[in-house]
Amino acid sequence: MSPHKIRRDAIKHGYRSGLELKISMALDTIRYKYDYESIKIEWEDLAYRTYTPDFILKNGIIIETKGRFLTMDRRKHLAIKKQHPNLDIRFVFENSRKKLRKGAKSSYAEWCIKYGFRYYDRIIPEDWLKEKGKNKHPKFIRFSTTKIRR
């Protein structure tokens, strides 16, 4: 099936990518409870922004699926990790061996290792699903800072 047909099929089912559809179907098959794009996480760049993670597992783990892992996505996730260190955000890549950009030596996997993110390829590993719960997330997670703005 062509990439355009895969994406069209995913959109028809309410997802943004073929990988998201594939993961949701796998979770549905094993009757695993999850939420799709159900929370928003506020983070600060030059302005306040919100991030909507792809999947929130019943144990509180946040799953972000990525076919392409662009510079702006990497920057965003580093900022979110710094601003919300209590969140357990993990990646499921289409291919974690893919290079960060053309001519780069580092791959998506190496970036995750360097910055302390857990990752896997194409599926959510069973041990992630079986991990004991961390916490439930509110529908909106606000950015909070202790620094005084002037």
Give the location of each predicted region.
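Nucleic-acid endo/exonuclease domains
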Residues: 1-150
